[in-house]
Amino acid sequence: MTPPAISLVLPVYNQADHIAGVVESYVPVLRRVGGEFEIVLVTNACRDASPEVCAQLAAEHPEIRTLDLVQGGWGRAVRAGLALTTGETVGYTNSARTTPEILALCAAYARAYPDMVIKANRRIRDNWSRRFGSLLYNLECRALFDLPTWDINGTPKFFPRAYSDLLALQRDDDLIDAEFVALCRRRGYPMAEVPVLSTRRHGGTSTTNYGSALKMYRGAVELRRRMDGGR
């Protein structure tokens, strides 16, 4: 069986009120860009009807698969979804913030440049505190990992399946994006960023707060130490 051109992983957390509409809007976009495609929906520690909604989507679309995780975590959901993908071009994104237009743009770049890692670079934040917190985090990661990017957490992220190290990420938390970008830098995977001008949420509430932000600042240092072999 020929593998699909594009595999897209969508972590889902308490998004029962809008995930069906989001996924339905992605289907024609991926079909137009890649032809054959697959979507892997990963519900994680949901307290609403997201698993049932995703199961219904999978029943209605042969291109969609779903996986329900008892434990939560952005990284855990991304990793579990990546493990199920079979496509030539693999990607993941924040389904609460990614419009069909943004997805189409990043996916088209990934298909046009099959040896490149493609990621979004979000140019707008919700408010000044998020902008400032993001700036601090990105400055920290740039210094720790010698990175050129200004938006570590920006999604969509797409990469060729041949870059297999990106299919074996280790973080179960929000640090998975820093791990992704740092690994690209260390392995010499070429990366291009696509400016994204919209960050409105389809629905739901961001789980980022001051506590989680501080955890990410500390976690970036721990990630650097682990990637250096524990030094």
Predicted regions: what is each one?
Residues M1-A5, D17, V27-P28, D146, ...:
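Hydrophobic helical membrane-anchoring modules
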Residues Q15-I19, C46:
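Donor nucleotide-sugar binding loop of glycosyltransferases
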Residues F37, P51-L84:
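Conserved donor nucleotide-binding strand/loop of the catalytic core
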Residues E38, E63-R65, P148, P190-A192:
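Conserved beta-strand segments of alpha/beta enzyme cores
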Residues L41-T43, D68-V70, N121, P195-L197:
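Residue-level recognition of beta-strand->loop/alpha-helix junctions
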Residues T43-E52, R97:
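A conserved acidic beta->alpha catalytic loop
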Residues L69-G72, R76-L84, T89-Y92, P100-D174, ...:
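Acceptor/aglycone-binding surface of glycosyltransferases and processive sugar-polymer synthases
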